[in-house]
Amino acid sequence: MRTEQLTAKAMEKVNFDKYLLANAVGKRAEKIANGAEVLLDYDTSGMKYTDIALREIAEGKITVSLEG
């Protein structure tokens, strides 16, 4: 899937809030970098942490919500 399509799909999951998406991708990428389990069902060895996080959100593997 192209990056633009993936981003559009992920944006739907966060009600088109680009700031929320950017924050969620950053936090999830940091967790992955620190050893969190990747939730995708295919090999991600050549992918950047941010790409993995974006795919997890787009595929609905993790839920993003506002806290507070």
Curated annotation (Swiss-Prot):
Output the Gene Ontology cellular-component terms: DNA-directed RNA polymerase complex
Looking up InterPro entries in the UniProt record yields:
DNA-dir_RNA_pol_omega, Pol_omega/Rpo6/RPB6, RPB6/omega-like_sf
The organism's place on the tree of life at top rank: Bacteria
Q: Which GO terms describe its biological process?
A: DNA-templated transcription
Q: What is the enzyme's main class?
A: transferase
- Which SMART domains does the record cross-reference, listed alphabetically? RNA_pol_Rpb6
- EC no. given is 2.7.7.6
**What does it do?**
Promotes RNA polymerase assembly. Latches the N- and C-terminal regions of the beta' subunit thereby facilitating its interaction with the beta and alpha subunits.
Name the record gives this protein? DNA-directed RNA polymerase subunit omega
**What's the source species for this entry?**
Sulfurovum sp. (strain NBC37-1)
